[in-house]
Amino acid sequence: MNYNQPATLQAAILDWAGTVVDFGSFAPTQIFVEAFAEFGVQVSLEEARGPMGMGKWDHIRTLCDIPAIAERYRVAFGRLPTDDDVTAIYERFMPLQIEKIAEHSALIPGALQAIAELRGMGLKIGSCSGYPAVVMEKVVALAETNGYVADHVVATDEVPNGRPWPAQALANVIALGIDDVAACVKVDDTWPGILEGRRAGMWTVALTCSGNALGLTYEQYKGLPAAELERERTRIEQMFEGARPHYLVETIAELPAVVRDINARLARGEMPQGN
């Protein structure tokens, strides 16, 4: 049996917060700040956004490894944070996250239309998140009330290693019955999510304005002066450089045009691993 390169995309694997729901990715960010505050440790919104895209325990561990935050913890507790301390913060983070997730559950403008267009082109819709399953259960239910149902969902604690490892993306490939990773596109607003897609051998699309990197509401984003928006896009594109996304667009609303372009490239024999 001979290997045949895929001629078209078969699946889009979408992130959740900052990609399909929660413009600006506020739900997890604010809760990190609140969870640390309950332990008497101040963390800014900007600091909390830094590791976004990772699983939430890993995110907290990464924050605790930042020298400035580690020093604040040492001042409060007389020692640097251990893994047990990270787990304690995580266990406080979880109920706060579940309690407040509904406050940031609105679909990103244009998401439903874009996803419907992808389905019309024959794509299955996979998904994955840095949220654990207990949070994803609520996120998925809220999205369904707003009209969005993915074909498959993989939470960060349903695989051995979360992002930037490729396990969640590859779990979607298996569950959706996709026969070639090059027939998949991974869409995300964070560099760990783009690295996940790259390491899985997929096409990747980084979202520059709807998620964690810009960190604004939709109204704030639309109200930005053109020059400021251009500066922010340049900053965010530079932030993504190391993850090497194949495409950068502002929001998921632009995804159908990207898919058409990828299909044209596949038809010419191009593959994601070679670009």
Swiss-Prot record:
**Could you give a GO molecular-function term held by this entry?**
magnesium ion binding
Task: Report the record's Gene Ontology biological process terms.
Answer: DNA repair; organic phosphonate catabolic process
UniProt xrefs under Pfam families: Hydrolase (PF00702)
Q: Which coenzymes or cofactors are required? A: Mg(2+)
The Enzyme Commission number assigned here is: 3.11.1.1
The cofactor note reads: Binds 1 Mg(2+) ion per subunit.
Asked if the keyword Magnesium belongs to this entry, the reply reads yes
Q: Quote the subunit structure annotation.
A: Homodimer.
Family statement drawn from the similarity comment of this UniProt entry: Belongs to the HAD-like hydrolase superfamily. PhnX family.
- This protein is called Phosphonoacetaldehyde hydrolase
| Source organism (scientific name) | Pseudomonas paraeruginosa (strain DSM 24068 / PA7)
Gene designation per UniProt: phnX
